[in-house]
Amino acid sequence: MGGVRLGDPRLDHFGELMSDTLNRRSFLQYGASAVTIGLTRRVQSVVPPLRNVERGSGGEDDLEETTIAQLQDAMRSGARTAQSICAAYLARIAALDSKLHAVLETNPEALRIAGSLDAERKAGKVRGPLHGIPVLVKDNITTGDRMMTTAGSLALAGNTPPRDAPLVARLRAAGAVILGKTNLSEWANIRSNQSSSGWSARGGQCANPYALDRNPCGSSSGTGAAIAASFAAVGIGTETDGSIVCPSSACSLVGVKPTLGLIEGGGIIPIAHSQDTAGPMARTVADASVLLGALSCHDYSASLDPNGLRGARIGVARKKFFGYSPEADALVETAIDVLKRQGAVIVDPADIPHAGEYDDSELIVLLYELKADLAAYLAQWAPSASVKSLADVIAFNEAHKTTEMPYFGQELFIQAQQKGPLTDQAYRDALAKDQRLSRTEGLDVVFTQQNLDAIVAPTGSPPWPTDLVNGDHFLGASSTPAAVAGYPSVAVPAGYSFGLPVGMSFIGKANSEAMLLKLAYAYEQAAKPRKAPRFLLTADLASA
């Protein structure tokens, strides 16, 4: 693989490279995390200046960890306006994002839009709980404004689509202010199995605000890092397998991977329609519930109950999902004790049949659908782009190797390009296998046999040191069963190991978001697990 090696001047010498290199898991496990706790070299990304950023009028420190309800109270009382809130978040981005590379660009119309929403409020019109609330969205979600939509790729640089994705239109209708676009693993981490999560040619390497040499996971890396750092009230990520829940775990957030189809998927630069979905990323369950409600037109906030764990039957999926990280295991065991103390009935173990048996068929499906779905997206949503197909993107990357492929290649793109149409029997067989083993012979079986309301497991391990030379160091994850089945999962903070976040996932049946959020909220209210990041250079080895 090309790219930098030790001694390259692009490396920042403030630590030792890991002494042991672990085998990297398949890209299908990018809902995973973690490697040994130790110092590493941090690669400094060479990135262009943040587009459109305005410093605003100050007050950014007041916004750290502020919730949607608190912002609404401030606007209702007159202590704040939507415009002053947006200005303060913009100032916070301007002051701190040089450490994270989490935000690709900010919306040049944000302050004007916020001002118009203030005028509505003054006239007695409040659209709902998102009125005047700043939201960051991942850069594979189409916005029909002056911001680009690129999936982090220079192949789509300058692409300003003519209209919003349906989910963005819903946010605007609910009164949200689209504050900016976040960095991501380029092309949502489907280009190479040697990639570094959070790296894109457009944005460089995104860092984790809990320890700047650690990875934020991906592919919704920038949304995770930005919301953890209080660059906006809430954010939107997308997931094919792990891309919401893993960065939520790595950045101590609540991440909701909804049931497939709950949120309209048009206008998202795709990997695969059989698994792709957008979802909320927030610092609290209540905020995630408000955002999911706006995206889906359901009132999930009404389900939140601090006593919601009483009598709930919660299974523990141990096989395949415990044992790869002692730190994650210990923190999740403590979280399970909280569930018990709050009145949940714990069914342990409640293993998921066939977990791990459909990784190969999942990859086949994703590669087939990528080729077809990307061409359809480019035709409908990026008609002025110079690239019209996956083949065009591959050719662009080859012609711009120094900027697009300095660290890793595009072997998954090439494999996808070699696939045939979606009428191929190989694709149909792989899709049928995925759905059978993940749904009817998988999650459906354990939920029915054990009469469960949810299943819990570690989301992943503590964040690993970012390594552009060798790529990500994954040990394990619990994202795949729900991702392949199209069922919901909610990641919540479980605790910290050496100051590094670890999450726990609640996995549910189809369309059980209200139940999962109720359980997650009751856990959160009892455990109070989240701490704000401190932007440390590396892990705090003095803490437990």
Which role fits each region the language model picked out?
Residues 86, 115, 165, 326-351, ...:
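Acyltransferase
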Residues 132-151, 308-317, 368-439, 493-501:
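Short helix-loop capping/hinge segments that flank enzyme active sites or metal/cofactor-binding pockets
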Residues 11-116, 122, 318, 334-337, ...:
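An N-terminal boundary/leader segment
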Residues 53, 57-241, 259, 311, ...:
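Gly/Ser-rich catalytic/binding loops embedded in alpha/beta enzyme cores
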Residues 428, 450, 462-480:
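Short, surface-exposed loop/helix-turn segments at secondary-structure junctions
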Residues 151-153, 206-212, 219, 269-277, ...:
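Flexible glycine/proline-enriched surface loops and loop-helix/loop-strand junctions
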Residues 10, 28, 95, 173, ...:
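Structural helix-boundary/capping segments
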